[in-house]
Structures are given as structure tokens and as C-alpha cells.
Amino acid sequence: MSKKRGKRIGFVSTRLAGTDGVSLEAAKWVKILTELGHECYFFAGECDWPEDHIYCVPEAHFEHPKIQTLQNDLFDDYTRSSKTSGEVHALRFVLKEHLRKFIEKFGIELLIIENALSIPMNVPLGVAITELLAETTLPAIGHHHDFSWERERFIVHAASDYLRAAFPPILPNLRHVVINSAAGQELARRTGASSILIPNVMDFNNPPGVPDGYSDDLKSQLWIDPNEFLILQPTRIVPRKRIELAIELVRRLDLPATLVITHRAGDEGLSYKQYLQEYAKIMDVRVLFAAERFSYRRDRTTDGRKIYSLADAYQKADLVTYPSTTEGFGNAFLETIYYRQPIVMGMYAIYRIDIRPKGFRVIGIGNVLEEENIVQARSVLTKPELKNEIIQHNYELCRRYYSFDNLKSRLITLLNESFGM
């Protein structure tokens, strides 16, 4: 599409801010769409895009107290109260009216819904979006990162009517995009809906530049000895990330090393973080829960200390751990390759199905950490030539399969279909 025919596109989600996978991947879509001449606007409960392009509604956030109260009655239970049903519909009405105002304010011609019709983190928002699309026939794209049936905490629920209607809805003006082939197959099996596969990407045609010096003091700021290895766990602290295996790896390496975790405890509670803290003490491993020192962009804490970017973290790391059991795609995998680091990772299903056949060289772990994994990790840490060989091989594969060029061509096709062109 030429810039003369650019469209006004509205992104909708519970949160479009920070370092979570949905927000980061949405930002890549925005970058490509903007380069294609389109104007992007944002509706969410939390948003860190320019003020003149956002419409922020607190009730759209999954952490809003009213939404949290609803979640507690809708999930991990078999029945819900009539009060909950009434509150869902009351909030649905409020959110739908705000969505209408968002569309009118910015003249939105296409909506891209980022996971808000995929996983029921905010049921009233999903129902509101569904009704709005049914009432307006506005072209829309559902960008699905993960579905409710993929998460154990949504298996038991009292929300069947909402899930069938809105997570995701099946509407003639809504096109579905999935990030892995298994999700597309399961979506078709459950709903009969077709989907388009657009995997996550990074800008592999423009590799990261040489560090500019800002992060030269990263180790000293975190009280890590210059001779210690920095092992990086660049994920949220949730059980499916299996961070205890990263702790075990550091213990068994028999090398001076510190494990740095860059993200906060996720939306599944703090008990897992407490478990990891206790486990690290038992294993005598230094683990830094350093979320307050890392963000998507560089900044300063309220007391003036440096906040480093995720890019800084990757570039100063010696090895990345990613022992997840389940991922929708695996942003940390792509980021590790982009910043030219070796990776120890879990062989989660999507990696085995969609990614591994392309020939990547990783240290793959199964249900337990085996001695072979320890030997391989120690080798890449102590043999620079081996490390360089692996990271260059992986980078070239990502340039071929997961670059911005791939995303650009697919988005052009998707938008042409959405507008009937």
C-alpha cells in the first residue's frame, strides 16, 4: 500500500505498555504499519504510546480491582453469582461506549485486537469488543498470542457463555492471526474458523549496534564481580518458565556465575517467586530479582539509579536461560538470537513443531536438567570460538525466517484482504 492510501488503525488490548510479549510484538506491527504509511492509535488500560495517540480506560486493564473481582468468581469455580453476571454486563456497556468514542475520536478504519479476544484476562472487554464488531461491521484483526484452552488456570470456570461468544468470536468482519501452527489447528477444530499464521519476528536485517557505554557499569551496579558469568533469565516469574532449572544450571556449572531475572512476578501470584527465593538459598546460588533495574527503555529509578534496557541485559549476558514448558511462540528465543547469545531452553511444543525443524543450535532440556546440558553450557561459556559459531549460525536462520521483511509482506496481504482490495 502507498502512503497516500494509509489507514487509521486502532490497536486494542488490556495493556500496551512495558516488556510483556504482547506489547513488544504489537510494537513491531506498529513499526511496520507506520513505515507503510498508516497511522496507529491505541486503546488500553495502560499505554505508553504518545499521549495524542492513546485512549486509556482503567477498566480495560486486567489488574483493575473490578476486573480482578470478576475473575475470582468466573474462574477456578463452577458457578458464578448473579451479581457477577450483572457486573460483567455493566462494565461491558461502559467499555463498549469508550471503544465507540475511541473510534470516533481518531477516525479508526481498522481495529487490531491484541490478545483481548484470545485469553479471558478481562471478560467485559472481550464481550464489549465482540458486540462492537457485530454492531458496526468495522474491519478487524484478532492477533492471538495464546488462547484460554492453552492455560491451566482457565480450565475450570463458570464463564462458558462468555468464552464461546467472545474468546474468540466468529464474525465475518474479524480475521484471525495466530503465532504458531498448533494454535491455528486448534482454533479451527474448536470453532471452524480459519486463521493466518504470522510468527513473531525481529529486525534481523538490522543487527544491534555496538554498545554505547551506558551499560558498561551494569555488572558493578548489580554487584556482580567482573570475572563472574552473567546468566540471564529474561522472562516473567511464572511457574511455566521453570526458572528453578536455571537455578540448578548455575549451581551445577561449577563456574562463578549469577542468575539475573529481568521481569516481575506475573499475573499468577507471588508464591512461585517465594519458592524460587527459597530454592536459590538451598542451592547456594546468587539470584537477582532485578525487575526494578530493567525495562523496555532506559530510564532512572526514583532515587536516581540507572534502569537498563532489555537490550542492555542481553548484550551484557554470557548465556541466556529459557527453560519454559509452554510458550505461544517464544519472544525470548528470538531476542537471544538477535543479541547474539547462546541459549539453554526447554523443548516446548511450539519450538519442536514450528522452529526446531529449521535447524537452530540450542542447548535443549527436557523434563530434567541432564549432565549433557551442563557440559554443553560450560563449553559455550568457556570456548569463544564455539560460541561465535553457534550464534552466527542461528542469526542467519532467523534472518531468513523471522525478519521484519517477512512480517511486512504478510501484513500487506492481511490489510488488503481486510479492506477487500
Language model segments and positions:
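Nucleotide-activated donor-binding/catalytic signature segment of Leloir-type glycosyltransferases, i.e.
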Residues: L270-D312, G359-R361
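A charged, aromatic-enriched C-terminal amphipathic alpha-helix characteristic of glycosyltransferases
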Residues: T382-N416
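Conserved donor-binding/catalytic core segment of Leloir-type glycosyltransferases
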Residues: F11, K219-S220, I224-K241, I247-V250, ...
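Short hydrophobic beta-strand element within catalytic cores of glycosyltransferases
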Residues: P342-G346, V362-I363
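Donor nucleotide-sugar binding/catalytic pocket of nucleotide-sugar-dependent glycosyltransferases
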Residues: W149, Y162-D217
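Aromatic "clamp/platform" in nucleotide-sugar-dependent glycosyltransferases that forms part
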Residues: T325
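A conserved catalytic-core segment of Leloir-type glycosyltransferases
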Residues: K4-G6, I32-E35, Y41-L110, F294-S295
